[in-house]
């Protein structure tokens, strides 16, 4: 073997060693890149999932807030229309107080209360429109004082001076009580339900 062959052989051997080392280094670099890539993918996947979860929670919170706001708005709107019905009923009281049944009811209540008072002094409050009806029932009874109340829409309110007791048969009070007890039914009629 001559020198050149020996040199070639040595160079080839060194080349092979370098090539093997480079191949190992390349494989190691690729392995490190793949591991880094996988780690980065996992890390960002976790961050993305956390952001998605947080966003979902925010959306659910906003959705719940909007549902509450919508319910509140609906309740306000329902209350508005129920109050409109109440106002219309109040407007109709003027027609009710003109009926014979109304006047008969006032007379019946007064007759019963005057009988039960047994000489106690009373003051009967009524609307100016009902004064003549009340005067007819009271007649010359000295224990009864009649006073008009411009705020009363109809009906009577009786104050017993001896006991300090007041019995209220005013149409407004009766209407309020009936309306409150029927509020659910009125809501169902207006907006559907049950």
UniProtKB/Swiss-Prot annotation:
One Gene Ontology term of the molecular function aspect: ATP binding
SUPFAM superfamilies: V-type ATPase subunit E-like (SSF160527)
Pfam families the record matches: vATP-synt_E (PF01991)
Chief location: membrane
Gene Ontology biological process terms, A to Z: proton motive force-driven plasma membrane ATP synthesis
Localization: Cell membrane
Keywords attached to this entry: ATP synthesis, Cell membrane, Hydrogen ion transport, Ion transport, Membrane, Transport
Residues of the signal peptide: none
Origin: domain of life: Archaea
Membrane protein topology class: Peripheral membrane protein
InterPro entries hit by this protein: ATPase_E_C, ATPase_V1_Esu
A GO cellular-component term linked to this record: plasma membrane
Subunit structure: Has multiple subunits with at least A(3), B(3), C, D, E, F, H, I and proteolipid K(x).
Function: Component of the A-type ATP synthase that produces ATP from ADP in the presence of a proton gradient across the membrane.
Similarity remark: Belongs to the V-ATPase E subunit family.
Name this protein carries in UniProt: A-type ATP synthase subunit E
Species this chain originates from: Saccharolobus islandicus (strain L.S.2.15 / Lassen #1)
Record gene name: atpE
């Amino acid at each position: 073997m001559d020198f050149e062959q020996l040199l070639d052989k040595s160079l080839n051997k060194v080349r092979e060693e370098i090539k093997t080392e480079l191949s190992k280094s390349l494989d190691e670099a690729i392995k490190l890149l793949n591991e880094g890539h996988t780690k980065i993918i996992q890390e960002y996947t976790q961050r993305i999932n956390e952001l998605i979860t947080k966003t979902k929670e925010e959306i659910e919170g906003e959705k719940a807030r909007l549902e509450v706001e919508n319910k509140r708005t609906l309740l306000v709107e329902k209350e508005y229309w129920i109050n409109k019905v109440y106002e219309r009923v109040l407007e109709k009281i003027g027609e009710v107080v003109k009926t014979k049944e109304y006047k008969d009811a006032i007379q019946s209540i007064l007759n019963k209360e005057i009988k039960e008072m047994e000489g106690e002094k009373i003051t009967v409050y009524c609307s100016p429109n009902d004064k003549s009806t009340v005067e007819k029932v009271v007649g010359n009874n000295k224990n009864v004082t009649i006073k008009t109340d411009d705020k009363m829409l109809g009906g009577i309110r009786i104050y017993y001076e001896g006991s300090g007791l007041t019995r209220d048969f005013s149409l407004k009070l009766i209407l309020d009580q009936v309306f409150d007890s029927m509020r659910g039914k009125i809501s169902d009629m207006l907006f559907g339900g049950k």
